[in-house]
Amino acid sequence: MNKIQVSICIILMFILSGCVLSLLDSYEEPEQAKFLGDILNNVSKKLQKKYTMRTIGTGIGMPDGVVTMLALSFEKTGPLTQEEGRAIIVGCVEEMIQTVNKNEKIRPYLENYPFTSNNVEIRLFLKTKEGNKIYEPDYGVISEIDGSVNYKYKSSENPKKYSKIEEEKFEEALKMVQNKSKK
């Protein structure tokens, strides 16, 4: 490239980066984003304390300002049995659903009211006391996504891929937890 072409490329880069930055500056956060941030913060603090775990992620699905999904991810010391994991996941999902459905300010922005387990995602990433990953035969991740509870294993031979996933419907898991608490 000659000097003129290099100069033109540099000038174009500055012009284009200026356009992109001006677009970013024009973004206005929707009103409901503040409500959702408060909801996620309050729920996560409550669940952290109740289940002795640490929040490591949050998520909001809000295409065109319509709230379709709320997510929380936690790190917890394990291993956990399926029964223990199920009870925690069900408790987390129920807390999120109740908190969202009680909040009248957010209702007009919800895709559906009442909010259900299909609108909530909860993930528990399990670690040893030393902070290491947990491998099969114990669960490494327990999650609730789209109304299903998943129990995932990783093998130490292939730690980047889940070697086994067990699944149950959230409603079934909820009934099992409720029946267990009646005993």
Q: What role is predicted for each listed range?
A:
Residues E29, A33-L36, G65, G78-I89:
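Solvent-exposed, acidic/flexible segments
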Residues G37, K45-P79:
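Short edge beta-strands and adjacent turn/loop segments
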Residues L40-V43, Q82-E111:
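Short, non-transmembrane amphipathic alpha-helical segments
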Residues K105-K183:
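Polar/charged, Gly/Pro-rich intrinsically disordered segments
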Residues N2, K76-G78, L126:
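Short, flexible loop/turn elements at secondary-structure junctions
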Residues C19-S44:
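N-terminal presequence-like segments and adjacent domain-start helices
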Residues M1-I8:
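Bacterial N-terminal signal peptides that target proteins for export
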Residues C9-S17:
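Bacterial N-terminal signal peptides
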